[in-house]
Regions:
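Conserved phosphotransfer microenvironments
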Residues: 20-26, 45, 57-91, 99-105
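Output/docking surface of receiver
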Residues: 41-43, 74, 98-103, 107-134
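Short, flexible/disordered intra-domain loops and linkers
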Residues: 14-23, 68-77, 284-294, 363-368, ...
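Conserved PLP-enzyme active-site core in the AAT-like
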Residues: 42-45, 51-54, 68, 107, ...
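Conserved N-terminal alpha-helix of the aminotransferase class I/II PLP-enzyme fold
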Residues: 188-237
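Two-component/phosphorelay signaling modules centered on CheY-like receiver
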Residues: 12-41
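Conserved PLP-binding active-site segment in aminotransferase class I/II-type PLP enzymes
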Residues: 122-208
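Conserved C-terminal alpha-helix-loop-beta "cap" of PLP-dependent enzymes
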Residues: 457-602
Length: 602
């Protein structure tokens, strides 16, 4: 916030005439400049809409509704700009400039969305500029989330520290040429923000007091949880916190055999008696979901009876279950169905959603994420979601969250659970990392979060369709129809539920693909996914649009080996030589991820 703030002025052509309105506008621009703002002008609605959707750093918007000019634009265009702003930011002040239009004549939608109505001749330019400055100051006070706001405020006070860390706000680095390079690279703000735990205004992360607690409660609201804990060791640590917080020695627990090693560690340390659900696998080697029938009480009891670990357990009734959602290749459970089944056997269900922190923020994932399980589900267990916030959202690496949806069926004492949290914590947390979790959560709040996810999924769909289109055109244009290109793990055709029409994936409308989960559902009787019909019945399994698996020639979904192929490692090596880093390499697959940080240039 130390950089100069700027105001976006979207108005019909000014500065080229000598009209009274033109001169009044120029005087207002000068007065705003005297308040310390830069005024960025655009004269067309197209440019204005482009700016408000591409650069969110403006502090306020001045929007011309009916100002005279050579290319005055329609009221409808101004309304589109207002909608474009509010689609991303519901707090930034919008000042509507109108010479002739009375407030009573404005559409109600406009009246609800604008901050103030400016008549250029009603007050002096200096007074209007002062009103604008007041609105901007109020906006910036409310803009920042709790922890980052206090960290910024503390740093601005330039307090002397006689506490750890020893670099003392980066000063130590300035005493050595190597340290100076380090300081130059990371910058003073980051180093000054690396503070000791004795900085009282910043509260206590371990005790959830002050700004850290305020931030966690804000994140809980945003993500739909009752409690949220910020974890600074990644989801590997978060998984262990959950396990250590709820599992007792010799408890029987139900675990996805595809679970992360951190869950195995938590089971080992707690002395749990694990009984494993076996997931599926297709011909590409992709690990799929655990079929729904394997979560049934009958199958659970069968697994417990067969397991040597169940002998001498405290009870033959399991106390906890853990499931990986989504899989590493982007296959998502119908979580509501999973919980409905597991609720018949366990009072606690833990979903490892390390790569899936964004699911709440787009309707295509409805029923498919942990914190979305209905509160009124009969006998609902306590639900735990572990997310690597840094993986797919905008937190620093190692930033993670534990979200908890409480249940009377399995009461959880906050202080007792916090002991497990503190066991994996530190009295020397990295404050910028906490701030990044605070900011990552705030960015996903409405309306910006859903908009970011809409854009992310739109980019992923564009990439998918482009790849499918290239492959299709190469086959059509080749002499023998045998030309090849890399494939994408997705259906070749989708069905519009409104019309029943079957459409090539690359020809489908964006709106259809972005709003219709059945376009991404794995259906029985289709060859492209490679899973058995009985394991994916109904809408149980859905492919995540944001996780894109590129298929190399050499094997198909049924595991049939071709005469020739290109292993995934070869493609990865090629891309690496072009400075393109991908997420994961399989035998004949390469995974790329679309997140809120993906650029269209990629």
């Amino acid at each position: 916030l130390s950089e100069k703030r700027w105001v976006l002025l979207i108005a019909s052509e000014v500065g080229r005439t000598d009209s009274v309105s033109d001169r009044a506008m120029e005087r207002l621009v000068d007065a705003i400049g005297e308040e310390g703002y830069e005024v960025v002008r655009t004269t067309s609605p197209e440019d204005g809409l482009s700016l408000v959707t591409s650069d969110p750093s403006y502090s306020t918007i001045l929007l011309d509704w009916d100002l005279e000019g050579e290319s005055q634009f329609e009221e409808r265009a101004a309304l589109d700009i207002i909608r474009g702003v509010r689609h991303r930011n519901k707090k930034v002040p919008i000042f509507l400039i109108a010479d002739r239009t009375l407030v009573s004549e404005l559409p109600l939608e406009v009246i609800k969305q604008v901050h103030e109505y400016i008549h250029l001749f009603g007050d002096t330019p200096e007074f209007i500029a002062s009103r604008l400055d007041t609105a901007v100051e109020r906006y910036h006070e409310q803009l920042l989330p709790p922890y980052f706001r206090e960290l910024l405020k503390y740093n601005d006070q330039s307090a002397y520290s006689w506490d750890a860390p020893g670099h003392m706000g980066g000063v130590a680095f300035l005493k050595h040429p190597v340290g100076q390079e380090f300081h130059r690279f990371f910058g003073e703000n980051l180093l000054r923000s690396d503070l000791g735990i004795s900085s009282a205004p910043l509260g206590s992360w371990l005790d959830h007091i002050g700004p850290p607690g305020d931030s966690e409660r804000n994140a809980a609201r945003i993500f739909g949880a009752d409690w949220t804990f910020y974890v600074l060791g990644g989801s590997s640590t978060s998984n262990q916190i959950v396990g250590h917080g709820v599992i007792a020695q010799d408890d029987i627990v139900l675990a996805d055999a595809n679970c992360h090693k951190s869950i195995c560690h938590s089971l080992t340390v707690t002395g749990a008696r694990p009984v494993y659900f076996k997931p599926t696998r297709n011909g590409y080697g992709m690990i799929g979901l655990v079929p729904l029938k394997r979560f049934s009480p009958k199958n659970v009891q069968k697994l417990i009876a067969k397991s040597p670990f169940s002998k001498d357990a405290r009870s033959q009734e399991p106390t906890y279950a853990v499931v990986t959602n989504s899989t590493y290749d982007g296959l998502c459970y119908n979580v509501d169905q999973v919980v409905e089944q597991l609720a018949k056997s366990v009072p606690r269900v833990h979903f490892d959603e390390a790569w899936y922190a964004y699911a709440k923020f787009h309707p295509i994932y409805k029923h498919r994420y942990a914190m979305g399980v209905p509160d009124d589900m009969p006998d609902r267990p306590a639900i735990f979601s572990v997310q690597s916030t840094h993986k797919m959202l905008a937190a620093f690496s190692m930033g993670s969250m534990v979200h908890i949806k409480l249940s009377d069926r399995a009461p959880l004492d906050f202080d007792q659970f916090n002991e497990a949290f503190m066991m994996h914590g530190t009295t020397s947390p990295f404050y910028p990392l906490i701030a990044s979790l605070d900011v990552a959560a705030a960015m996903m709040d409405e309306p910006a979060g859903p908009t970011l996810m809409d854009e992310t999924i739109g980019d992923a769909i564009s990439f998918r369709q482009a790849m499918a289109s290239i492959a299709h055109r190469l086959r059509v244009e080749s002499a023998n129809g045998e030309a090849w290109f890399f494939g994408i793990y997705q259906p070749e055709r989708v069905t519009d539920p409104a019309t029943g029409e079957s459409i090539l994936f690359e020809d489908a409308e964006d709106e259809l693909l972005m709003t219709t989960p059945t376009c991404w559902t794995l259906h029985p009787g289709e060859d492209w996914h490679g899973y058995q019909d009985e394991d994916i019945d109904g809408d149980y399994c859905m492919l995540d649009p944001a996780k894109v698996t590129i298929l190399c020639p050499g094997v198909n979904a049924q595991g049939i080996i071709a005469d020739w192929g290109i292993p995934g490692a070869v493609l990865t090596e090629f891309l690496d030589s072009r400075h393109v880093e991908i997420a994961r390499t399989g035998d004949y697959t390469v995974l790329v991820l679309f997140s809120v940080g993906t650029s269209k240039g990629k």
